[in-house]
UniProtKB/Swiss-Prot annotation:
Keyword annotations: Amino-acid transport, Cell inner membrane, Cell membrane, Membrane, Symport, Transmembrane, Transmembrane helix, Transport
Physiological role: Involved in the import of serine and threonine into the cell, with the concomitant import of sodium (symport system).
Gene Ontology MF term list: neutral L-amino acid:sodium symporter activity
Organism name: Vibrio vulnificus (strain CMCP6)
Main location: membrane
Catalytic activity annotation: L-serine(in) + Na(+)(in) = L-serine(out) + Na(+)(out); L-threonine(in) + Na(+)(in) = L-threonine(out) + Na(+)(out)
GO cellular component, one term: plasma membrane
UniProt cross-references to HAMAP family, sorted A to Z: Ser_Thr_transp_SstT
UniProt xrefs under SUPFAM superfamilies: Proton glutamate symport protein (SSF118215)
Recorded topology in the membrane: Multi-pass membrane protein
Name of the coding gene: sstT
Name recorded for this polypeptide: Serine/threonine transporter SstT
Record-level GO BP terms: serine transport; threonine transport
Protein family (similarity comment): Belongs to the dicarboxylate/amino acid:cation symporter (DAACS) (TC 2.A.23) family.
């Protein structure tokens, strides 16, 4: 009986507080017994694995169900959300340019990242994304190709729009069932994050990062400015309300989990659950959240811009204002295609370096620096990208609700 009440108390407890306890315990275990900390890393791997496993089917079913059950003349308001995604990504690149010029970074270059194949140009990134769009639906689900999953989900939803009410009800019930499984997995987050934190501290330590402290400060400052100044300003313009309660809730409930899972895909179920908690329109967020995980890449734009300009400063290349603005545009467009590149934002650095005539050898050494600081850079980048998906979706939903009230 006591056993059951303990489980019930855990299930009804404050998830954010439980995650905080998991973080503290993980750090403590890594300091006291690194070998034990490495072994509990399996808990983290299991948690991330479960999220990654459920995310593709969740997106596919939710998108198909929401479009199939959409009432006539009902709008999903995707256009303003996509506009905010793209504008936010460009502002992120611009912020990184300004900070990189105010506090120029020079790098001690290391040997190149072995076995990495950066794209040859922006056309290759676009080509990869287009082929992902027409991927086999089964393969898209198996390989977590969210561009393909969205395309097939939308296609099936539109086809089912004219199906019988019974068929639509089956899809609606399926989406509720998958959401229940997601809620169960998210309740296990404290254990997963405990394992992730313990193993990260035990295996990496932070000695390796000390030499790149200046670069990390510039990167993290740019991300903080976007999360705490630019995003709230964009939300205020859209809703004319105090944006900070929403921003802090999204950082707390989406950003923290994303920081430790380091995967936008794994954080899709967490974001979906948060949107449900915020009582947003399901027809809107079931499409905008997986789409955001694919194209809303403010963190990636900051990483590409900052590391490219660090390479520029290291090589002693002079950069004029127009080239810096062009870099912002290239970084923003490249970042939106980061999901179309194995290795994500780091492997798009050579593409941006090409603007300044920096050789591929030097660019790959900069990528290697990115991998060294990745434990912090990738975590912060994912936290910013993923939490911003909910911030912008909620802002547009709130704005449209205000318009509807008149």
């Amino acid at each position: 009986m006591q056993h059951n009440s303990l489980i019930a108390r855990f299930a009804q407890g404050n998830l954010v507080l439980q995650i905080l306890v998991g973080i503290i315990l993980g750090i403590s275990l890594a300091l006291v017994s690194p070998s034990s900390a490495e072994s509990v890393g399996m808990l983290g791997s299991l948690f991330v694995g479960a999220l990654k496993a459920i995310a593709p089917i969740l997106v596919f079913i939710l998108v198909a169900a929401s479009i199939a059950n959409q009432k006539k003349n009902q709008h999903t308001h995707m256009r303003p959300i996509i506009a905010m995604y793209l504008a936010g990504t460009f502002f992120a690149a611009l912020t990184a340019v300004v900070l990189s010029f105010m506090f120029p970074t020079t790098l001690t270059l290391v040997t190149g990242a072995e076995g990495a194949n950066p794209p040859q140009g922006i056309l290759e990134v676009i080509k990869t994304l287009l082929f992902k769009l027409v991927d086999n639906p089964v393969n898209a689900l198996m390989s977590a190709n969210y561009i393909g999953i969205l395309a097939w989900g939308v296609g099936l939803g539109l086809a089912l729009h004219h199906a019988s009410d019974t068929t639509k009800a089956v899809f609606e019930d399926l989406s509720h069932s998958v959401s229940h499984i997601v809620r169960f997995i998210i309740r296990l987050a404290p254990f997963g994050i405990f394992g992730l934190v313990a193993s990260t501290f035990a295996t990496t330590g932070f000695d390796a990062l000390a030499g790149y402290a200046h670069l990390l400060v510039v990167l993290l400052s740019a991300m903080a400015i976007i999360a705490l100044i630019v995003n709230p300003a964009m939300v205020y313009v859209k809703t004319k309300q105090n944006p900070y309660p929403l921003v802090f809730q999204c950082l707390r409930e989406s950003g923290v989990t994303a920081f430790f899972t380091r995967s936008s895909a794994a954080n899709i179920p967490v974001n979906m659950a948060l949107c449900e908690k915020l009582k947003l329109d399901e027809d809107t967020y079931s499409v905008s959240i997986p789409l955001g995980a694919t194209i809303n890449m403010a963190g990636a734009a900051i990483t590409i811009t900052t590391l490219t300009l660090a390479a520029v400063h290291t090589m002693g290349i002079e950069v004029d204002l127009m080239t810096a603005i062009l870099l912002s545009v290239v970084a923003a467009v490249s970042a939106c295609g980061a999901s179309g590149v194995a290795g994500g934002s780091l492997l798009l650095i050579p593409l941006a370096c090409g603007l300044f005539g920096i050789s591929n050898d030097i660019a790959m050494q900069v990528v290697a620096v990115g991998f060294i600081i990745g434990v912090i850079q990738d975590s912060a980048e994912t936290a910013l990208n993923s939490s911003t998906d909910v911030v912008f979706t909620a802002a547009v939903c709130e704005s449209e609700a205000q318009k509807a009230k008149g």
